[in-house]
Amino acid sequence: MLQKIQSKKIQVRGGTFAIIASKYNTRYVDAMLRAAQSELKRAGAKVVVVRVPGAYEIPVVAAKLARLSTLNSQLSAVICLGVILRGATTHAQHIGEAVRNALAQIQITHEIPVIHEVLLLENEQQAKERCLGRRHNRGTEAAQTALEMARVMKGL
């Protein structure tokens, strides 16, 4: 029988976290990136940032980092940041679904937390609320989730 893992009690100080951030919708993604970096650095973590052109390019980099981490156990988690704004066609929906499915498969295959904060949003107002707000920033939430998952994985 597995013992119950209480991640709050397992201390993960430091660690190395990769952040993959899209260059598309830079204003919003950069705000999430700054917030995530700040949260991770506050926890004593080392942060590696990789910038990619758009959200669709995030999974291939996540897969490469996850595979390399499987070989040398260097990363505690991979955080993926992007903003996709819906338009008049279904293009954004297709990109969002492809990214979501790929990131889920990567974390299952490589057994490394892949934190999905590639936001599929209706409009710029939603982007402002989720990325630029002082009280609410998805970059901060992504970093907190990554730290929590690092604790969980270390405890297994």
List each model region and its residues:
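Short, basic, low-complexity termini and linkers enriched in Ser/Thr/Gly/Pro
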Residues: M1, I5-R13, R67-A77
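Glycine-rich phosphate/diphosphate-binding loop of Rossmann-like nucleotide-binding domains
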Residues: K8-V52
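C-terminal binding/interaction regions
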Residues: G15, A92-L156
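Short, ordered loop/turn segments at secondary-structure junctions
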Residues: K23-Y24, V52-A55, V83-I84, L119-E124
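Generic secondary-structure signature for well-ordered alpha-helical cores
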Residues: T26, R34, K41-K46, A63-R67, ...
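N-terminal beta-loop-helix "entrance" segment that forms/cooperates
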Residues: V49-K64
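Glycine-rich phosphate-binding loop
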Residues: V61-S69, Q74-L103, Q107
